[in-house]
Structure formats: structure tokens, C-alpha cells
A protein has these predicted regions:
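General detector of N-terminal leader/presequence modules that precede the first folded domain
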Residues: 1-36
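Interaction interfaces in information-processing and related assembly proteins
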Residues: 22-75
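Cys/His-clustered metal-coordination modules, chiefly Zn-binding fingers
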Residues: 64-133
Length: 133
């Protein structure tokens, strides 16, 4: 049985920074390991990533250590997409941005190597993002 890549603290930090930089490179990030409540989880740790939006932790994004870097980055971008537009600093700003002229956010998907941002209307690929590991 393969347990997967087992992400490490430094790798999660790199992926979190990469995702948050897409929203705003000036945002600080807090990252904390989460206690393992599952005694059968042998796949490594997990973390909560908190972008400090509007000067505080407004939401956390869960990352599991057994995920691939692509899945973890997709989760981080999707978590930002779901929550950032509800904050004062990014109110109603579509994230991740879709194609030029579109007012809605791109959808977040993943393939083997990249996070894929797609227009929800056309299905066209807006951007491919490779994890910076």
C-alpha cells in the first residue's frame, strides 16, 4: 500500500505562499499542524493554513499530508476562492480571475501535473499552475 508523497512543513509553506500570492503577495500566512484524531492515519500530518485577510485569520484551509502537491495547491486555491470574496479587502473580487472580460471566478480543477483554472461558462482553460516544489 502506497501512502503517497507525505508533504512536509516546508512544502506546505511553499504551496500556501504560492496560492496566496495569486490573491495578494502582501498577505501574511499562518500555518499550524493539526492534531491527528485518526489513529489509523499513517499517511503523515495535516495542517491548517490561515491567510491573514483584513489583518486577522478569517478562515482556515485544511491540507492533508498524504495529498500530492497538485491536490494540496488546488485545495488552497479553492479555499481562497470560496472565502476571500467575503472579506472586506476582497469584497466581490472574482478569484481566481477568469478570462479577460469575465466577471466570475475561474473554476479550480487539477490534473496529474498542474492545477487547472477553467472558465465555468466555456470550459476553456484560463491558466495552468504547476506547484513550485
Amino acid at each position: 500500500m502506497s501512502l503517497g508523497p507525505n508533504l512536509t512543513d516546508p512544502q506546505v509553506a511553499v504551496l500556501a505562499r504560492q496560492a496566496v500570492d495569486l490573491l495578494d503577495p502582501e498577505l501574511a500566512i499562518d500555518i499550524r499542524p493539526t492534531p491527528c484524531s485518526d489513529p489509523y492515519n499513517r499517511a503523515g500530518g495535516s495542517w491548517l493554513v490561515w491567510p491573514r485577510i483584513d489583518g486577522h485569520r478569517s478562515f482556515g484551509i485544511y491540507v492533508q499530508g498524504s495529498w500530492t502537491p497538485v491536490r494540496a495547491l488546488a485545495q488552497l486555491i479553492d479555499g481562497l476562492a470560496e472565502n476571500s470574496s467575503e472579506s472586506k479587502g476582497f469584497w466581490s473580487r472574482p478569484f481566481p480571475p477568469c478570462a479577460s472580460g469575465h466577471r466570475h471566478p475561474a473554476g479550480v480543477d487539477a490534473d496529474t501535473d498542474d492545477v487547472v483554472l477553467r472558465c465555468p461558462d466555456t470550459g476553456d482553460v484560463v491558466e495552468r499552475i504547476r506547484p513550485a516544489l
